[in-house]
From Swiss-Prot:
Protein function: Formation of pseudouridine at positions 38, 39 and 40 in the anticodon stem and loop of transfer RNAs.
Reaction equation(s) it catalyzes: uridine(38/39/40) in tRNA = pseudouridine(38/39/40) in tRNA
E.C. code: 5.4.99.12
GO MF annotations in UniProt: RNA binding; tRNA pseudouridine(38-40) synthase activity
Organism: Nanoarchaeum equitans (strain Kin4-M)
Lineage of producing organism: Archaea, Nanobdellota, Candidatus Nanoarchaeia, Nanoarchaeales, Nanoarchaeaceae
Active site residues according to the UniProt entry: 28
Protein name, entry field: tRNA pseudouridine synthase A
Enzyme type, top EC level: isomerase
Amino acid sequence: MYYYKFWYFRPNKAIAQLIKGKWISRTDKYVSARENYFYGNIPKVLPKNVILLGEEPINKVLSKEYKYFLPKDKAIEQISYLHKVGNIIVRKTKIKVKGLPNLDLMKEAAKHFIGKKDFTNFTIEREAKNPLCTIIKFDIEERKDYYVFSIVGDRFLYHMVRKIISFIVSVGYKIYPLEYIDLVFKERLNPKPKDADPKFLWLWKINKT
């Protein structure tokens, strides 16, 4: 089956609201896409910042890759103040943070997300009916003015990537202890991580046959 291939930048609505039909990935408002695929009727006039790149055949989607380009001066804004995991209190009070997150802590935290996990803590309630997802790759790179988070998975739940980013940054600022990280896939986080800013998130690649 042939799909239309699109590029778009920070749309002012979820892409499925702007162009109705079957999308391979239903990205949120302000989330950009280097490539996304659509099956259906294309409107005569495309929304602003949405570009049709062509057509490609798709038999099966193997995985999706997202990249989050986090400016260093926006890192603190992505923090989630996490209080409990299960019955364990991980932070009694808010702490003042400054500077940049610890890159080594963030990289170590990212390793724990690889594999088939229960991502109930990283989505909204209505998406938690089937919370099992497999993360194939999760890398973090430091550039001069920003960090690049690259995450590849077989599927992603609603808001999942943005909540993961907020959580990882919180680990980098020592808000959430690394020693309790595996519990987030077994016990309930209270509160759940907030959604990191969608403007820095890109759907980067659809791996397909």
